[in-house]
UniProtKB/Swiss-Prot annotation:
Full protein name: Hyaluronidase PH-20
Membrane topology: Lipid-anchor; GPI-anchor
Stretches of the chain forming a coiled coil according to its record: none
Gene: SPAM1
InterPro entries xrefs: Aldolase_TIM (IPR013785), Glycoside_hydrolase_SF (IPR017853), Hyaluronidase (IPR018155), Hyaluronidase_PH20/Hyal5 (IPR001439)
Sites of GPI-anchor amidated serine lipidation: S492
Source taxonomy: Eukaryota, Metazoa, Chordata, Craniata, Vertebrata
PANTHER family: HYALURONIDASE, HYALURONIDASE PH-20
């Protein structure tokens, strides 16, 4: 999988502070380290939820059998009129009377503008649609996919500026005495007020009717970091977009999940720019998830595609999976949703091509990162949280060590992983990652990984690590083994760990980034005395 480097923080004049001040600052900063919370898993013992949301239900593979989707905890199709799924995707024609202007024909649908559609009429129809697509209240994901206009006026740039132009025309037709500047201001106010009402009241209705599902809007939050052609692209989200996301606090307050998207274009194929793009978008989603309450963050389910957005018949290569999935997992999200269109399943040939891609490239990699992440969470967090990067903006990945492990596709079509982790593998976890504890759980990083005596973790379809470890013991206070409940009564035996190389510059404890902050304080403390 290639070598991945780890960037480390350079410490400045930390020694300028007295020992007492260092101690005081450390104690002040420790709570900020321990406050890095994540939402608990939707399904117990499934810290990383894999969701398949593509129309493959009629696909037949090379063995004349349906595609094997057993790896995914939730499988659903975005086809219309399919009801009672664990993931429900509401397009513009499936939830109420969403007002928009058809981007292809220019046709006005339901008034075209939120100012011109009766909200109560929309909500009555939305109620019917929710009860139709979700006949029972069960645990699942409810995603509203409204992309035609954005609730933030300024973000409706070309070609969505038609909503701004039509809104201005509406105000001028109603109030011809207004000058242009005032008409624009009124149009902005009216558009944002009614757009907010449409999105917010629809969200509240969904939560009231089906409270067990996690409700949110697809592509929210976004950070518009697609400036790939700029020199020295680093993937950062423009500061103005962070502020605009802050201004959507009303939306985050009533969402029960976030559904950002990190679809890749061929412009970043096999390029580090793809990793930077994904990394920063996910990091912004994590920031937004904590705006309302950093101790009770919203769960985040990231949408990905298996193909490029501008080349819908070209599958992502392994490098691109590393730059997407590989970036998402160590940042610490609740799950990943794989979305696909009919282009994946338009013929028998395309179905067989998808099956071959899944068996040869996709599933081995997903198994890799899933078990690595779960093992890290068990070893370092005792299953009370998930492993996340100590420094989010580095190339450290939760991968198996290719020297110690091998994922094999057996003749029966099932995967098995051979090998077991070395002490060095577990030490890599401790060097590069720390625990982000689940909400309302007090956990801390395990530092004595040499005392780990066994690992036991599984994927949802029971591809398991069940290994007894025989590391030299440095202490007599060995702890009992930690087990994964999902591995009970399973026959598969496998092992996995991280592939990030060791670095002598990484601090041996999980306070490295806090100490970095401390170093900043130390450099400026003398000016405060």
């Amino acid at each position: 999988m290639g070598a991945f480097t780890f960037k480390h923080s350079f410490f400045g004049s930390f020694v300028e502070c007295s020992g007492v001040l260092q101690t005081v600052f450390i104690f002040l900063l420790i709570p900020c380290c321990l406050a890095d919370k994540r939402a608990p898993p939707l399904i117990p013992n499934v810290p990383l939820l894999w969701v398949w949301n593509a129309p493959t239900e009629f696909c037949i593979g090379g063995t004349n059998q349906p595609l094997d989707m057993s790896f995914f905890s939730i499988v659903g199709t975005p086809r219309k009129n399919i009801t009672g799924q664990s993931i429900t995707l509401y397009y513009v024609d499936r939830l109420g009377y969403y007002p928009y202007i058809d981007p292809h024909t220019g046709a006005i649908v339901h008034g075209g503008l939120p100012q011109l559609m009766n909200l109560q009429q929309h909500l009555r129809k939305s109620r019917q649609d929710i009860l139709f697509y979700m006949p029972t209240d069960s645990v699942g994901l409810a995603v509203i996919d409204w992309e035609e206009w954005r609730p933030t006026w300024t973000r409706n740039w070309r070609p969505k500026d038609i909503y701004r132009n039509k809104s201005i025309e509406l105000v001028k037709s109603q109030h011809p005495q207004y000058n242009h500047s005032y008409a624009v201001a009124v149009a902005k106010r009216d558009f944002e007020r009614t757009g907010k009402a449409f999105m917010l009241e629809t969200l509240k209705l969904g939560k009231s009717l089906r409270p067990s599902s996690l409700w949110g809007y697809y592509l929210f939050p976004d950070c518009y970091n697609t400036h790939f052609t700029k020199p020295n692209y680093d993937g950062h989200c423009p500061p103005i977009e962070l502020q605009r996301n802050n201004d959507l606090q009303w939306l985050w307050n009533d969402s029960t999940a976030l559904y950002p998207s990190v679809y890749l274009t061929s412009r970043v194929r096999s390029s580090q720019n793809g990793a930077l793009y994904v990394r920063n978008r996910v990091h912004e989603s994590i920031r937004v998830s904590k705006l309302m309450d950093d101790k009770n963050p919203l769960p985040i389910y990231v949408y990905i595609r298996l193909v490029f957005t501008d080349q819908t018949t070209t599958f992502l290569e392994l490098d691109d999976l590393v730059h997407s999935v590989g970036e998402i997992v160590p940042l610490g999200v609740s799950g990943i949703i794989i979305w696909g269109s009919l282009s994946l399943t338009r013929s028998l040939v395309s179905c067989i091509g998808l099956e071959n891609y899944m068996k040869g490239t996709l599933l081995p990699y997903l198994i890799n990162v899933t078990l690595a992440a779960k093992m890290c969470g068990q070893v370092l967090c005792k299953n009370q949280g998930i492993c996340t990067r100590k420094d989010w903006n580095t190339n450290t990945y939760l991968h198996l060590n290719a020297t110690n492990f091998d994922i094999e596709l057996q003749q029966n079509g099932k995967f098995v992983v051979h090998g077991k982790p070395s002490l060095e593998d577990l030490q890599e976890f401790s060097k590069n990652f720390h625990c982000s504890c689940y909400t309302n759980v007090a956990c801390k990083d395990r530092l004595d990984v040499h005392n780990v005596r066994s690992v036991n973790v599984c994927t949802a379809n029971n591809i398991c690590i069940d290994a007894v470890l025989n590391f030299p013991s440095l202490d007599d206070d060995d702890e009992p083994p930690i087990t994964d409940d999902t591995s009970q009564n399973q026959d598969s035996i496998s092992d996995i760990t991280s592939s990030a190389p060791p670095s002598s510059h990484i601090l041996p404890k999980d306070l490295s980034w806090c100490l970095f902050l401390l170093s900043i304080f130390s450099q400026h403390w003398k000016y405060l005395l």
